[in-house]
From Swiss-Prot:
Lineage top rank: taxon: Bacteria
Organism phylogeny: Bacteria, Bacillati, Bacillota, Bacilli, Bacillales
UniProt similarity note: Belongs to the anhydro-N-acetylmuramic acid kinase family.
Amino acids binding ATP: G9, T10, S11, L12, D13, G14, I15, D16
One GO molecular-function entry: ATP binding
Species this protein is from: Bacillus cereus (strain AH187)
Keywords, ordered alphabetically: ATP-binding, Carbohydrate metabolism, Kinase, Nucleotide-binding, Transferase
Function: Catalyzes the specific phosphorylation of 1,6-anhydro-N-acetylmuramic acid (anhMurNAc) with the simultaneous cleavage of the 1,6-anhydro ring, generating MurNAc-6-P. Is required for the utilization of anhMurNAc either imported from the medium or derived from its own cell wall murein, and thus plays a role in cell wall recycling.
Name of encoding gene: anmK
Protein name listed in UniProt: Anhydro-N-acetylmuramic acid kinase
Length: 382
């Protein structure tokens, strides 16, 4: 089957689309990436998403309209990846669309029950591409008592499980998440959870203090020094002390967190602030390994992916934090994969599993009571 996986993440840097060929289903699936592209959001759409994400500035009319606008954006992104690959849209069998997360409430709080909302209307995508769309992957896991995240572990087992080595996969998107993949000969469980901020705080600080979308290759962070006072403040965030499985998002590490941090520590240079929040991402990742993984799993390889793996300063900070551990650190490209395409490929794989009616959540990662088939199916017009 030919499937387009569509991902718009918490970094808001655009729409990632992976055109993938998948043979079979389940753990024996054979997956080949045909083409990958990122379609940037226009400024107006990005501004509307940012407004929709804000509790103070959002409104139901905006979210209603944006749901359909993003459906068109996702449909156009699928057309673009097919065009770039010289692949006929009529040959496409499925689209797996994650959607744009507007709010994620992984656990009950006050009178709010556990819930999640991703938008990007699948009916619009299906109609505009004349292709079956599978979307809304997180909700069934939450209905089964899970946190709806992380969802990529299932695809990571298919793609990365090694016959003899335990591997640890770290995604560094807007949020960081880790998956422990035991070797094929191991009887240990796959576990996965969010490690805290990935690029989210780094990008927000970069935009506010340097008027740049992100710190390219970590060049600015390389120039500054870590401020221990700020790092201690960040590392005391209650999310870090929670036991897995756990998930987080912009609600905890987004604009409000950055606003409070910058107000509290405005006396420090902007370079030192950026260096310190970069170290916070690295330190939160290393902390979770040492606290929740390395005492229980003998890890041979750590594989870094996502946009953060291109931040050389961040990667070196992670390497330094793990210098005394017996594991080798790679980025996706070192082993023949793409850091950028990883999550989009994951949602193509999840769409394939849903099409075959196979459960594809990992209860040991999400906390769900049982394995369930994920996603809603939207058929095109006849």
């Amino acid at each position: 089957m030919y499937i387009a996986g569509v991902m718009s993440g918490t970094s808001l840097d655009g729409i990632d689309v992976a055109l993938v060929r998948i043979e079979g289903s389940g753990v024996d699936s054979k997956v080949k990436l045909i083409h990958f592209t990122t379609v940037p959001f226009c400024n107006d759409i990005k501004s509307e998403i940012q407004q929709a994400l804000s509790i103070e500035n959002s409104n139901v009319q905006l979210i209603c309209s944006l749901n359909f606008k993003l459906g068109l954006c996702f449909a156009n992104a699928v057309k673009e990846v097919c065009k770039e690959a010289n692949f006929s849209l009529e040959q496409l069998d499925l689209i797996g669309s994650h959607g744009q997360t507007i709010y994620h409430q992984p656990k009950p709080e006050g009178n709010m029950i556990a819930s999640t909302l991703q938008i990007g209307e699948p009916a619009v995508i299906a109609y505009d591409t004349n292709t079956t769309v599978i979307s809304n992957f997180r909700t069934m896991d939450m209905a089964a008592g899970g946190q709806g995240a992380p969802l990529v572990p299932y695809s990571e087992v298919i793609l990365y499980r090694d016959p003899s080595k335990n591997r640890l996969l770290q995604n560094i998107g807007g949020i960081g998440n880790v998956t422990v993949i035991p070797s094929q000969k191991s009887d240990q469980n796959v576990i996965a959870f969010d490690t805290g901020p990935g690029n989210m705080i780094i990008d927000e600080v970069c935009q506010r203090l340097f008027q740049l979308p992100y710190d390219q290759n970590g060049e600015i962070a390389e120039q500054g020094e870590v401020v221990d006072e700020i790092l201690t403040y960040c590392m005391n965030h209650p999310f870090l002390k929670m036991n897995p499985p756990k998930s987080t998002g912009r609600e905890q590490f987004g604009e409000e967190f950055v606003s409070q941090l910058l107000k509290r520590y405005e006396k420090y240079s902007k370079e030192n602030i950026l260096t310190t929040v970069t170290m916070f991402t690295a330190s939160s990742i290393v902390y979770h390994y040492k606290e929740f993984i390395l005492p229980y799993y003998e890890i041979a390889e750590v594989i870094l992916g996502g946009g953060g793996s291109y931040n050389d300063t961040l990667v070196e900070m992670i390497r330094y934090g793990l210098k005394d551990e017996k594991c080798t650190i790679f980025i996706q490209e070192d082993i023949g994969y793409s850091s950028e395409a990883k999550e989009a490929i994951a949602f193509a794989i999840l769409a394939n599993e849903t099409y075959h009616r196979n459960p594809s959540n990992v209860p040991s990662a999400t906390g769900a009571k049982k394995s369930v088939v994920l996603g809603n199916v939207t058929y095109p017009s006849i």
